[in-house]
From Swiss-Prot:
Molecular function in Gene Ontology: rRNA binding; structural constituent of ribosome
Span of domain KH type-2: 17-86
Gene symbol of the encoding locus: rps3
Xref: Gene3D superfamilies: 3.30.300.20, Ribosomal protein S3, C-terminal domain (3.30.1140.32)
Phylogenetic lineage: Archaea, Methanobacteriati, Methanobacteriota, Thermococci, Thermococcales
Name of this protein: Small ribosomal subunit protein uS3
HAMAP family: Ribosomal_uS3_A
Keyword Ribosomal protein tagged: yes
InterPro entries attached to this UniProt entry: KH_dom, KH_dom-like_a/b, KH_dom_type_2, KH_sf_prok-type, Ribosomal_S3_C_sf, Ribosomal_uS3_arc, Ribosomal_uS3_C, Ribosomal_uS3_euk/arc
Length: 210
């Protein structure tokens, strides 16, 4: 049980760090992180479309992030490594954040979703799924799903081949959740795929949106 509690605690900590970095590094095109324990401490890999923003002038921002990770989140001797995202359109986290930003600027959720889907597919993705959930058009919360192309839905391919990202938009009506899943161009799929040749939109139940 002690081992289980440790892994749960570490998973929660990584989730909280991810949420913090998403807010702090939105302008950098934040695309997620990877935390690894090393003999010298903790290696934190930050993926970003604009690494220069993460580093900051003279390394000021990355030093401040290092202090926060150590003092606020309790990471032991954190060493930050910033890696550039070569194609942000194939990173689900980046796209989820961009859709959330579009919603916060007042862009209609359908327009934001279809624009993102076109950009993702035109950059070579084999498939994409976007779910936008919350009070989208009125008082009743709902979830709308947009999808196109090939996407692994179950099993190991869905876990290892699909890029997944989540972000939130803070609107007057409340919080809007944005989930994005992208199948990259080089993914090699078994039979567990869903094939959608044209863009599709559908409203799903609140239970399915969870």
């Amino acid at each position: 049980m002690a081992i289980e509690r440790y892994f749960i605690r570490e998973a929660v900590k990584e989730m909280l760090i991810d949420e913090f970095l998403e807010k702090e590094l939105r302008r950098a095109g934040y695309g997620g992180l990877d935390i690894k324990k090393t003999p010298l401490g903790t290696k934190v890999i930050i993926f970003a479309a604009n690494p220069g923003y993460v580093i900051g002038r003279g390394g000021r921002r990355i030093r401040e992030l290092t202090r926060i990770l150590e003092r606020q989140f309790g990471l032991e001797n954190p060493q930050i490594d910033v890696q550039e995202i070569k194609n942000p359109y194939l990173n689900a986290k980046v796209q989820a954040v961009r859709i959330a930003q579009a919603l916060e600027r007042g862009i209609h959720f359908r327009r934001a979703a279809y624009a993102a889907m076109r950009a993702i597919m035109s950059n070579g993705a084999r498939g994409v799924e976007i779910r936008i959930s919350g009070k989208l058009t009125g008082e009743r919360a709902k979830s709308v799903r947009f999808y196109q192309g090939y996407l692994a839905k179950v099993g190991n391919p869905a876990e290892t081949l699909v890029s997944k990202g989540y972000a939130q938009a803070l609107l007057k009506l409340g919080v809007i959740g944005v989930k994005v899943a992208i199948m990259p161009p080089d993914a090699r799929l078994p039979d567990e795929i869903e094939i959608i040749e044209k863009p599709v939109e559908e409203e799903v139940s609140s239970n399915e949106a969870e």
